[in-house]
Amino acid sequence: MNRRDFLMTSSCFLATPAVALAAQAYAPGLVKQLLSEGKTVFVDYTTEWCTTCAAQKRTLARLLKETPAYGQMIEFVTIDYDQFGRGELAKELGISRRSTLVLLHGDQELGRIVAGTSSKQIKALLDIALSAAMAA
């Protein structure tokens, strides 16, 4: 391997976030199943092309790196808004747009952020989720 190949390969690893959001890809019924198991579920309605969604993902990845308990205690589910934005769950939750983060536990919605990218705001939602998960 020559130096150029090594540098190009190495730069790919540096561009990858240190902690990726370990979210489950959505399938109909998944969120209800997790809730019936007593889990605290953090739902992210997102798209590949949404810049606000990308900012939310970066913030979530950083917060998960800072507080690993979030990833250990909370179930994260990513829902493609383009595919499921008009689906049954979206209707039940009243989801009107992408870049919506919803926190669920049991049969209750514990919090919601619509198009917010503030680290403080997202951390507050994660803290509520962590408290709910630990109390369960």
Tell where the protein language model's regions lie, with residue ranges:
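N-terminal export signals
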Residues: 5-22
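Short active-site neighborhood of thiol/selenol oxidoreductases, capturing the structured segment around
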Residues: 36-48
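The canonical Cys-X-X-Cys-His
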Residues: 50-53, 101
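Typically the conserved alpha-helix immediately C-terminal to a functionally engaged Cys/Sec
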Residues: 54-68
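Thiol-based oxidoreductase modules, predominantly thioredoxin-like and allied folds used
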Residues: 70-86
